[in-house]
Amino acid sequence: MDYISTRDPQRTPATFTDILLGGLAPDGGLYLPADYPQVSDDTLTTWRETLTTKGYAALAAEVIKLFVSDIPAEDVEAICARAYTTPTFSTPDIVPVTELDDNLFIGHLSEGPTAAFKDMAMQLLGEFFEYELTRRGETLNILGATSGDTGSAAEYAMRGRPGISVFMLTPAGRMTPFQQAQMFGLDDPNIHNVALDGVFDDCQDIVKAVSNDAEFKQRYRIGAVNSINWARLMAQIVYYISCWIRITDNNAQKVSFSVPTGNFGDICAGHIVRQMGVPIDRLIVATNENNVLDEFFRTGAYRVRSSADTLETSSPSMDISRASNFERFIYDLLGRDATRTAELFSQREGFTLADDSAFPAAAQRYGFLSGSSTHADRVNTIRDTWERLGVMLDPHTADGVRVARGLRDQVDTPIVCLETALPVKFSDTIVEATGREPDLPERFAGIMSAPRHVTDMPNDAAVVKDFIRRTVAG
């Protein structure tokens, strides 16, 4: 399996281990498989049997081996077995699926150590990083940005691993108290939290700026764990397949997915699964008030907001105005035209494809629908689901459920809403909606009172670089 950059007209090939530790391509593009593997009906049957008889880790290994040709198959199997196990995940199913309403399901992705769907990819990424760094005899300094859940998932996946340090940028004051406690309460000499004066997109821009400095990146061994890293998406591919298997009886049955998203990472994995030939019907983009992606799928205009225009909402992990993974989909939508993709994404204020002949394919060929949700929508959905069904949703998952219900008349297949996090991470909104505090899983007892470890910084890439430089030097 070769990988190519979305901005490279020459389609220069790279292997999985070439791109694993780096994140962005040297030209600033994002990596994708040169060709998506195509799965047969026999393969789908084998995967169904594997999940049923051997479990999630075994299914993950079979899927991931399609994308990783330069690591021995038995090593991939061992890596997956270490990543997806109990008690790291609180259930042996790893990703259970339950029915919420008639033909509306929840794919439970928050059974990992930080109670967020990001654990699904990060636990695997941690195992791959340690494997490859050990093989090379190298070290790595991970630089990431988080709007809430990526940071804690990355830190819990990487802590204690030899040769790995984490520098995680967060938007100051824009995470919930629980999210801050999860990250800033982690006491590990190789974990470095930075509270940046800005919003998530400012954090992400600094990550990209540092990654684009080839000399600095090479000298200080900078790696990435944000969803710009291909391995994150590769891991997410697996749970689309497992959810499809769990609610179907045969390979002819299709399933749709409603995905709360701001960065277009999680749903991009669904797009790839659909391109592989797995029977997925519609992919529903569910946004909050920061509806950049919903606006694109409705109008063809991708209109990037400024930091000042990025709203602070009650589903904060989606408070994003520039979707860093969107380039991967646009590359496919434009027939993998790298030159045009590079031109479009060099326009910092966005672009429009409203009059482009390719735009209708977003819905017609690639199956996308979209919708947005407000604070009132979230609160009402959480309250209704709790009072009527006895199920408590976090605000992001509530966005996904609300949008899925609103588009129900356009979807003829069962819909799986992918859970974002457990409600405990967003207690203020849960209390507003239900009048009660969400349950605190036992593994988080005492987290709110732990000492904090965080460094405040201005929105300045040079300052962040200097902090990395001084920290690495010791």
Predicted ranges, named:
Residues 1-474:
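PLP-dependent amino-acid enzyme catalytic core
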